[in-house]
């Protein structure tokens, strides 16, 4: 184990810097997705907003530009790692799905049996044939099945479609207006296994996943990795063993005393000395000035960690405690202290906070700066 010690302050700063939520320097949305490997994405537009926060300010494409990267197929949305939507680069999709499909199928087993997924082979064949003609919305697919005398809807349809995604038959297509579509997997995903080459190897895939996870998440425990990835503790320890001298075990201090955290042996300065990076989001670069982040409800700053997630949550705040449509996380200096929501209209966007404590004047001003960023992102007048 390394002789260095890391406390909660260092780990939080390193995570903010590694996630590129401080001193953001990534050039485009696909690069940001690839940096994070997989980004939880059932909240589609908020997830894209979160990705654009990790780009250089002069490289941020706005909402329409972020969607365009998905429409072009540079980024796709599918079920990987855990049984929920994630955004991934199209050239990572094949190996990520093949790696995680057995675990997700296992997690879905009870629901598969409940809705009778195994008995819906004909329905799957109809869906696959339809998307080979052109991308289809879920509503279109439901209508097509009904027209063929095989109606499916609700949860049953959802699990049939998810199983087809995990079997590498379906993946997201371009938006149809405001609606998501399904497309043929091979039409949107390149052949081969991206960084793994032409053949899939499970050990190589686990190593690739863990190496890239640590590069973008800084420090994490074995349980953090397992909870994020959906793999077992045994799988994670096996991957760490395969990485060998490429990773370093670091003992925690302070609130992390007793924990063993892992980082890459060649971790960059953002991880080893994050101080110079973490105050740079403020216009004047003053590290003592509070920085507000408007984070989507499933931002990777939260979802990447289970065991040590409390580092980013203020005392008395529960990430699962969502009041109405205020589902997103309002953070000050990387720690969630409230909720926020946006309501996007044709000409304006309303941004509303729910502070769980009274903000200081400086924090309120920092929030207003982020409201202005939302206005720019959507190309609409902002109201609060």
Q: PLM features: residue spans?
A:
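Short, amphipathic alpha-helical interaction segments positioned at domain boundaries
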Residues: 98-109, 186-209, 273-285, 292
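Phosphate-backbone binding and catalysis cores of DNA-processing enzymes
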Residues: 1-153, 317
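Positively charged, polyanion-binding regions of nucleic-acid-associated proteins
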Residues: 118-135, 202-218, 240
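Short, cationic-aromatic polyanion-contact patches
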Residues: 87-93, 176-196, 256-279
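Short amphipathic alpha-helical interaction segments
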Residues: 60-68, 151-163, 233-240, 322
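A short, conserved structural fragment
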Residues: 71-80, 84, 165-175, 244-252, ...
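Non-catalytic regulatory appendages
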Residues: 242, 246-315, 321
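Glycine-rich, small/acidic residue-mixed loop/short-helix segments
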Residues: 314-384
